[in-house]
């Protein structure tokens, strides 16, 4: 058990035993740190944990107080997308959300989106209100504004958070949204390939036409990015698949790879729309007799947890689903800092990171 956990449990014991009374003002953070013999940073983290769990209230300019006994019990509803598609990010961030809720003493229920969409609005609103939820995690994204569940959630008048959203989600829904800086993340992945010495990079993107923005860029902008990084910039280096059409996706990705490798100047690396596309590139490369990374480097995007178990482990731009899940739980526990905030900010960025793994060869010293 680490020092922060020790402090949290000891202060919680003092509160539950009544030694620290509801409404009682505690010493400041520095004094508490000295009393417990821990660093000030450790105490700050412990106090934040207690605030998130509702044990204490921190009022800036006034101090730290033991929460009143009538403090609202936190209870969240997870609304799942209702599909078994392994590419849905919610599947990978929800375990971290649930773990954090458990640590913070939050009760969690789950509902399937299909159920909500086929239930009468008035009755569903009444039922959800009767359950006294204090927050909703809407584990779906890409709203067009016509979804029947939206008026249900709005009538509840409680915080709704999308833990992995599209750029337009907050504007369309009015809900809080966690997301990556997708444009910067995509650029950073390409920059990493350049740093590894790659001058010819093929892109396998998901899209149905050349006008759609993919990872924040049009096709022409993707070509400009290749040129900006000193890479071969030609439309022959870009292939499109539609990952939403799962039927035959494996064969379509293989055809994309064959098209790229048939070029007069075939790519040294493939930068994939997602880690799931990268998985199919692995399979196609194996059937084509290409070794990764000796013959072809492969880079993914998203941070699918299973990528590290591929052979070789998949290099990727990790959108950090773990951080998204934990942050979502903490934000729903502390809505005062965003839901009730008058500045109107609804979009919150989860930092990405480059996972440097063996699927990308390093052709020069970095």
Question: Regions from the language model: what does each represent?
Answer:
Residues 1-38, 48, 89, 125-130, ...:
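Extreme N-terminal segment that seeds HTH/winged-HTH DNA-binding domains in transcriptional regulators
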Residues 10, 14, 175, 250, ...:
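Flexible loop/turn connectors
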Residues 22-23, 199-200, 233-237, 292-297:
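Short acidic capping loops at alpha-helix termini that bridge into adjacent secondary structure
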Residues 27-28, 57, 62-68:
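Minor-groove-contacting beta-hairpin "wing" of winged helix-turn-helix DNA-binding domains
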Residues 29, 68-135:
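Amphipathic helical "hinge" segments at domain boundaries
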Residues 77-78, 132-141, 161, 202-206, ...:
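Periplasmic-binding protein-like
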Residues 81-92, 110-121, 142, 177-188, ...:
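Hinge/beta->alpha junction and helix N-cap segments in small-molecule ligand-binding domains
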Residues 141-185, 276, 302-314:
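Flexible loop/hinge segments that line or gate small-molecule binding clefts
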């Amino acid at each position: 058990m680490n020092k922060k956990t020790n402090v949290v449990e000891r202060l919680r014991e003092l509160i539950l035993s009544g030694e620290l009374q509801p409404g009682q003002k505690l010493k400041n953070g520095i004094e508490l740190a000295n009393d417990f013999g821990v660093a000030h940073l450790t105490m700050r983290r412990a106090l934040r944990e207690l605030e998130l769990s509702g044990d204490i209230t921190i009022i800036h300019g006034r101090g730290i107080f033991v929460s009143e006994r009538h403090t609202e019990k936190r209870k969240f509803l997870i609304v799942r997308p209702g599909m078994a598609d392994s590419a849905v990010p919610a599947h990978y961030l929800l375990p971290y959300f649930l773990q954090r809720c458990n640590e913070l003493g939050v009760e969690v229920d789950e509902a399937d989106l299909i159920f909500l969409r086929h239930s009468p609005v008035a009755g569903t609103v009444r039922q959800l209100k009767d359950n006294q939820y204090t927050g909703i995690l809407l584990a779906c994204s890409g709203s067009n504004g016509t979804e029947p569940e939206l008026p249900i959630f709005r009538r509840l008048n409680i915080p709704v958070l999308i833990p992995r959203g599209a750029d337009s989600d907050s504007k369309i829904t009015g809900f809080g949204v966690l997301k990556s800086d997708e444009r910067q993340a995509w650029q950073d992945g390409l920059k990493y390939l350049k740093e590894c010495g790659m001058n010819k990079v093929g892109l396998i993107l998901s899209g149905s036409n050349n006008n759609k923005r993919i990872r924040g860029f049009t096709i022409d902008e993707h070509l400009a990015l290749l040129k900006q990084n000193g890479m071969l910039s030609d439309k022959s280096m870009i292939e499109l698949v539609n990952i939403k059409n799962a039927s035959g996706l494996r064969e379509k990705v293989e055809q994309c790879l064959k098209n790229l490798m048939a070029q007069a100047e075939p790519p040294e690396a493939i930068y994939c729309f997602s880690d799931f596309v990268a998985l199919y590139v692995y399979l196609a490369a194996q059937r084509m007799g290409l070794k990764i990374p000796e013959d072809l480097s492969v880079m993914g995007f998203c941070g699918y947890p299973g990528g590290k178990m591929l052979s070789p482990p998949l290099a990727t731009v990790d959108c950090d689903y773990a951080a998204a899940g934990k942050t979502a739980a903490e934000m729903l526990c502390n809505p005062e800092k965003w839901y009730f905030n008058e500045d109107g900010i609804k979009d919150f960025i989860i930092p990405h990171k480059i996972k440097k793994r063996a699927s990308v060869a390093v052709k020069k010293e970095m």
